[in-house]
Amino acid sequence: MNIKIIGVGKLKEKYLKQGIAEYAKRLGTFCKFQIVEVPDEKAPEKLSPAEMEGVKEKEGERILAKIKDKEYVYALAIEGKERSSEEFAKELEDLGTYGTSDITFVIGGSLGLSPEVLKRANTKISFGRFTLPHQLMRMVLAEQIYRGFMINAGRPYHK
């Protein structure tokens, strides 16, 4: 199975890079895992609604360019469906069982995801109504993917 996380912007924080590297190493037992960064759109602090949509559209085009037709896409979105770790693990298992070998997770920039990216997504997933930095979300997501594989393997990581 191939798992990819597409994130907007370059990860700068050393502690997040280290955390993601640790989960990437652990995930190597279960899948081919990669993080793909697409450049964020430079924008002034105050934007009109039209300018905000323009930023999301440009970032969305960069995201969509990294997704192949056969990939199953999860968009991280506040309006997405919340899942327990066990439900998420079951989804990952079912996707693999039914022949999906390429799974992509998309994390938008500070303004969120474009309508085009949300439309391309096979499903939307939410980690709750909290607002988290999108850079931190990469590590949280990598941990949950690892947790899902550990649950499916019957290993004692998840309590």
Curated annotation (Swiss-Prot):
Signal peptide: none annotated. It is an enzyme of class 2 (transferase). Keywords: Cytoplasm, Methyltransferase, rRNA processing, S-adenosyl-L-methionine, Transferase. Disulfide bonds: none annotated. The keyword rRNA processing applies. S-adenosyl-L-methionine binds at L76, G108. Belongs to the RNA methyltransferase RlmH family. It is found in: Cytoplasm. This is Ribosomal RNA large subunit methyltransferase H. SUPFAM superfamilies: alpha/beta knot (SSF75217). The gene is rlmH. GO terms for molecular function: rRNA (pseudouridine-N3-)-methyltransferase activity.
